Amino acid sequence: MDTRRLILVLIFTFSSFMLWENWQKYNQPKPADAVAAAPVSGAAPTPSAALQAKAAPGTPPVATPVSTAETFSITTDLLKATISAQGGDLVSLELLNYKEHDDIQKNFDLFDAKHQYLAQAGLIGEGLPTHRTTFKHVGGATKLADGTDELKVRLESADQNGIKVAKILTFKRGSYLIDIAWEVANGSDKAIAPHAYYQLQRDDLAPAGETKMVSTFTGPAVFTDADKYQKVTFEHIADNKAKFTKTADNGWLAMVQHYFVSAWVPKDKTQREFYMRKVEGSNVFQAGVIVPVAEIAPGAKGEASVSLYAGPQMQSALKQVAPGLDLVVDYGWLTVVAAPIFWALEAIHKLVGNWGWAIVVLTIMIKAVFFPLSAASYKSMAKMKMLTPRLAQLKERFGDDKQRLNQEMMKLYQTEKVNPLGGCLPILVQIPVFIALYWVLLGAVEMRGAPWILWIKDLASADPYYILPVIMMVSMFVQTKLNPTPPDPIQAKVMMMMPLIFGFMFFWFPAGLVLYWVVNNVLSIAQQWQITRLIDAGGKAANDAKA
């Protein structure tokens, strides 16, 4: 296989990878065993008979419309949360350390009203408050004070049949975790056994900044110890074909999007039931978890609490929140390669303090690891380049006899001790590393808003002036000049077009990925030029000796 075929193989492999990833996203196979998810109107969910035990859920009360409900804000060192009096819903959650994709003057709002994205919670049981019930904020601070580590927000609903209910949200310093707790005081004359539900609501539209060239998964996901990480598409929920674990005594439920995640994390060994559903007549979906509250005798109090993580997909933080939560940073089928690459990138960043330079250093390290393979490849290419005139002569002599031409070419390769596959195999070995690095740079929230130098203000966004893609095209053009020229004029023209095709594709790729490619190309050019120069010098010396 000569150089032109090698490059064509690389292009075909990369293109196939991109097509496969997008095919998986839009054409996932139909699951055999589906969990029913009938359209709903936004009412409280109903637990299954197995989870209900003695509970008898009733009809939720009529709520104040969202448009007329009052709101108030809570501010910590990391968050600015807006809470609605209706249900005590989290209707806005600004992440103070992250900016909007299309307006860096604004904080990124995870619970974005444009996507009808919010976190809701309620109780299931006759007369008990749901996410449609009006609550009252019972005083207290709305800003985390200096020197304090947590801020509690207490909401109370109107008494129903002697039952008093309070919803307490606890915000913590330096954390994206919010504890959502229920206090139920049973002043009635009979025991009650309510359930608490916690759900995330969102439409099916991709977040701002997503393109088909660099699209990632958006939708709900479930994790349990038994069945591990399970992504569920909005399409499968809408078609009643969603497949996921429904009951367990461990695990969490999340709503995933590029760079960020919100997840309900009940306490371990608490029996729970996961559900997903489409709100009737809309493109809005709800995914949640139901947990039982212990039976509350007359005159007694009961409590239930679940943690909500709502923030960036920082792997180190996610691992501490719950087992498997770091899997929302999805590297696909190359996780075994991508995970150590990210670990190395993070370690380098701690030393150099800049993610752009960390990418440069990591590229040099990867190039050093593959140096022997690359050297073997470039030596083979250089020898093939020296044989180009003789191969052209053979083609001119035996062009009409393909079998004889191939025989003569193989004789030439054997005589000159050249392996035509030598330039291909070493580079093919590196393809999984490149694809894994692609997913690392695409999925790492650390790259979002991270500057490099001068005009590169965000390594997760495309180069605004297309300087890096142009440099990449130039570097690829130089590489084609260092490679053997195809004897076929048409193939030669195709090879000359490849830098333009690749460069055009990379106009929309994250700058961090293009930076890796540029640095890799520059190092490859230097290595290939040096090897070619040495081989040319050796060949010339051998010819002089023969003369």
Swiss-Prot record:
Gene3D superfamilies: 2.70.98.90
Domain of life from the UniProt record: Bacteria
Classification via InterPro entries: Membr_insert_YidC, Membr_insert_YidC_N, YidC/ALB3/OXA1/COX18, YidC/Oxa/ALB_C, YidC_ALB_C, YidC_periplasmic_sf
Protein localization: Cell inner membrane
One GO biological process term: protein insertion into membrane
Keywords, ordered alphabetically: Cell inner membrane, Cell membrane, Chaperone, Membrane, Protein transport, Transmembrane, Transmembrane helix, Transport
GO cellular component terms, semicolon-separated: plasma membrane
Similarity comment: Belongs to the OXA1/ALB3/YidC family. Type 1 subfamily.
Subunit structure: Interacts with the Sec translocase complex via SecD. Specifically interacts with transmembrane segments of nascent integral membrane proteins during membrane integration.
Protein name: Membrane protein insertase YidC
Organism listed in the record: Dechloromonas aromatica (strain RCB)
Species classification: Bacteria, Pseudomonadati, Pseudomonadota, Betaproteobacteria, Rhodocyclales
